[in-house]
Amino acid sequence: MGLPWYRVHTVVLNDPGRLLSVHIMHTALVAGWAGSMALYELAVFDPSDPVLDPMWRQGMFVIPFMTRLGITNSWGGWSVTGGAIPNPGIWSYEGVAGAHIVFSGLCFLAAIWHWVYWDLEIFSDERTGKPSLDLPKIFGIHLFLAGVACFGFGAFHVTGLYGPGIWVSDPYGLTGKVQSVNPAWGVEGFDPFVPGGIASHHIAAGTLGILAGLFHLSVRPPQRLYKGLRMGNIETVLSSSIAAVFFAAFVVAGTMWYGSATTPIELFGPTRYQWDQGYFQQEIYRRVSAGLAENQSLSEAWSKIPEKLAFYDYIGNNPAKGGLFRAGSMDNGDGIAVGWLGHPIFRDKEGRELFVRRMPTFFETFPVVLVDGDGIVRADVPFRRAESKYSVEQVGVTVEFYGGELNGVSYSDPATVKKYARRAQLGEIFELDRATLKSDGVFRSSPRGWFTFGHASFALLFFFGHIWHGARTLFRDVFAGIDPDLDAQVEFGAFQKLGDPTTRRQVV
C-alpha cells in the first residue's frame, strides 16, 4: 500500500488494537527521551556553585522540572541547594531518570504486544462483529482517571501529605527550597505567584474531572449531539485532543515567559520583565537604604547584599538577550560567573553621585550616559571627541566600589572609569570566566526562553492541526463527495466523482 508520508496514519484508522499500540509506543519514546535527557544533563551538570553557576546558567532543561516537583538530591552525593547528601534515597535525580527509562522499556514491550495481538475481543462490537470503540465511554474513563491523578497531585504531592511538596521561594529567588504547601482557597489562590493556588486548583480541577468523568460514564450523549459532533469518528478525538494540547501549550508558554509560582527563577532564571522594571535593582537599593538608616557605612551596607541577588541584576541573565539561533547555555555566551566585583558608584569632580543609564533589553549597543539624581546628563563617553562637553576626562569622573571583591577600591584613571561605566550599563559587574568553555561573549537565552519559544511555536502549529482535523471530521461527507441529501440511487463506479452525474465514466 503506497501511502504518501502525510497519510501513513490511515493504517490505524479502523484498527483499535494498533491505534492503542502506536500510542503506547509514543509514550515509550517520550518517557525514554525524558530519562535519557536527564542522565545526559546529570553527566554534564556542575553542582559546585548554586549561586553563580545555577542549573539555568548551565542550560539544564529537564533538571529544573524535576527540581520544582521535589527532587533535589543526587546519588553523586550532592544537593542542588549546595552541600553534601550522605543518603539521597531512591527518588534522586538518577532514580527518577532510571524510572522513566524502565517505564519506557515496559511501554515498548506493551506496544509490540498490542501490535501483534491487535484483534482483541474488547475492540469488537458484539452487534456487528466489526472493530469499534465506544468513544464517549472511553472519554469518561480518561476524564475520570485524569481527575484522580490531578486531585492526588494537589491533595497529596503538593501539600506534602504523601509526597515531598514543591519548590517554593521568596519573591526575589533567594531562599528557595522544597516544602509542603497548604491550599489557598481564598482570592489569593488566583494570584499566579502564590504556590497555594497550585494545590487548591489541582484539588478543584481534579474533583471536577472526577465528577465529569462519572457523568460521561453514566450518561449517553443525545443522538443529535452524537451525530452533530461526529462522536463516533476517531478523527474527532484527534481534533479535540490537539485542541487541549495547544491550549495547554499556550498557557504554559505564558506562565514561563511572564513568570509564576510554577516557574521559579532559581530553577529557570529571571524573566525579562524583571530587568525591564529594575525589579532586583530596586530591592538592592531598598536593602542598602535600610542599612544606611541603621548607621551602616556604604561599604557595610553593600557588603550585606547577597551575591545571588546581585547576580539576578545582570543583563546577561535576561532570557530576551539571547538570539533565536544562538545555541548553547548562558555559560557558553558571556562565560561562567566567578565573583561579584562590587557595586560601582561614580562621582564627578563636584562630588555629585552619577548613575549609568542601563541598556534596554533589545539593544545590542547603547551609549554610555551618566546622569545625576535628578536625571540630568552630567557625563558620557562621546562618539565624537571634537564636540564633547561631558566626557569622563572633562567632567573628572571617578569610580569607587562598595561590596564584592573590589570593596573600597577607587579609580580615577579615565580609561578604567570608562571601562567600568560600560560594564555598569549591563547591571551589577561580575568577573566572568570565558576560557573554560571557550565562551564567545555573545549573550544566550536561558531555558525559560527556549521553553517559551518551543511551546508557543508548537501551540501555533497544533492550533492549525486542530482546525485541519476538526474540519476533516465535521465535513467528511463533503470531502468524500457524497451529498447527504442525494435521493437518487448511486451506483459506485458509475461516476468519476461519486454521485456527480456530470462525471459519468465513458465506456470505451
UniProtKB/Swiss-Prot annotation:
Gene3D superfamilies xrefs: Photosystem II CP47 reaction center protein
InterPro entries referenced in this protein's UniProt entry, alphabetically: PS_antenna-like (IPR000932), PS_II_antenna-like_sf (IPR036001), PSII_PsbB (IPR017486)
Molecular function as annotated in GO: chlorophyll binding; electron transporter, transferring electrons within the cyclic electron transport pathway of photosynthesis activity
Taxonomy, superkingdom: Eukaryota
Keywords: Chlorophyll, Chloroplast, Chromophore, Membrane, Photosynthesis, Photosystem II, Plastid, Thylakoid, Transmembrane, Transmembrane helix
Gene Ontology CC terms: chloroplast thylakoid membrane; photosystem II
One Pfam family here: PSII
Cell location: Plastid, Chloroplast thylakoid membrane
GO biological process: photosynthetic electron transport in photosystem II
Membrane topology: Multi-pass membrane protein
Record's cofactor remark: Binds multiple chlorophylls. PSII binds additional chlorophylls, carotenoids and specific lipids.
Annotated transmembrane regions: 21-36, 101-115, 140-156, 203-218, 237-252, 457-472
Family matches, as NCBIfam families: PS_II_CP47 (TIGR03039)
Its biological purpose: One of the components of the core complex of photosystem II (PSII). It binds chlorophyll and helps catalyze the primary light-induced photochemical processes of PSII. PSII is a light-driven water:plastoquinone oxidoreductase, using light energy to abstract electrons from H(2)O, generating O(2) and a proton gradient subsequently used for ATP formation.
Subunit field text: PSII is composed of 1 copy each of membrane proteins PsbA, PsbB, PsbC, PsbD, PsbE, PsbF, PsbH, PsbI, PsbJ, PsbK, PsbL, PsbM, PsbT, PsbX, PsbY, PsbZ, Psb30/Ycf12, at least 3 peripheral proteins of the oxygen-evolving complex and a large number of cofactors. It forms dimeric complexes.
PANTHER family assigned: PHOTOSYSTEM II CP43 REACTION CENTER PROTEIN (PTHR33180), PHOTOSYSTEM II CP47 REACTION CENTER PROTEIN (PTHR33180:SF35)
Family in the record: Belongs to the PsbB/PsbC family. PsbB subfamily.
Protein name from the UniProt record: Photosystem II CP47 reaction center protein
